[in-house]
From Swiss-Prot:
It comes from Pseudomonas putida (strain GB-1). It is an enzyme of class 3 (hydrolase). It is found in: Cytoplasm. GO terms for biological process: L-histidine biosynthetic process. Its main location: cytoplasm. This is Phosphoribosyl-AMP cyclohydrolase. Mg(2+) binds at residues 77, 79, 81. Pathway: Amino-acid biosynthesis; L-histidine biosynthesis; L-histidine from 5-phospho-alpha-D-ribose 1-diphosphate: step 3/9. Belongs to the PRA-CH family. Keywords: Amino-acid biosynthesis, Cytoplasm, Histidine biosynthesis, Hydrolase, Magnesium, Metal-binding, Zinc. One of its GO terms (cellular component) is cytoplasm.
Length: 130
């Protein structure tokens, strides 16, 4: 039997884009990257674990903020080069800016307009004890 991870078309850096969506509403919460290890751990631990390109290490979503993403379902697109994680976003905040979604800006009249409110001050999110 073929290893399920071998079916994924990893990019030249060994990564695949991963889109997190709210499992109830379908709203796109964020996009991050996964490597083979992070995807395998996500499936095993049933929580989102990404690969941080800037830090060069595994990133367990919510490890600093407490805003864990509980995995409900993993999906692979038709070209096998994008993953969707259907998640329950604990704390209802996916973005490091304190918003529900990282996609909080809308293109309007030639500029990006902020349309979603900050739910919690990022300084309060990332202070000790969340």
């Amino acid at each position: 039997m073929k290893d399920w991870l071998d079916e994924i078309k990893w990019n030249s850096d060994g990564l695949v884009p991963a889109i997190a969506q709210d499992h109830k509403t379908g709203r796109v919460l964020m996009m991050a990257w996964m490597n083979r290890e992070s995807l395998a751990l996500t499936a095993t631990e049933q929580r989102a674990i990404y690969w941080s390109r800037s830090r060069g290490k595994l990133w367990r979503k919510g490890e600093e903020s407490g805003h864990v993403q509980k995995l409900h379902e993993l999906r692979l697109d038709c070209d096998a080069d994008v993953i969707i994680l259907m998640v329950e976003q604990l704390g209802h905040i996916a973005c490091h800016t304190g918003r529900e979604s990282c996609f909080y800006r809308v293109y309007e009249d030639g500029q990006w307009k902020i349309v979603d409110p900050v739910l919690k001050d990022p300084d309060a999110i990332y202070s000790a004890g969340h």
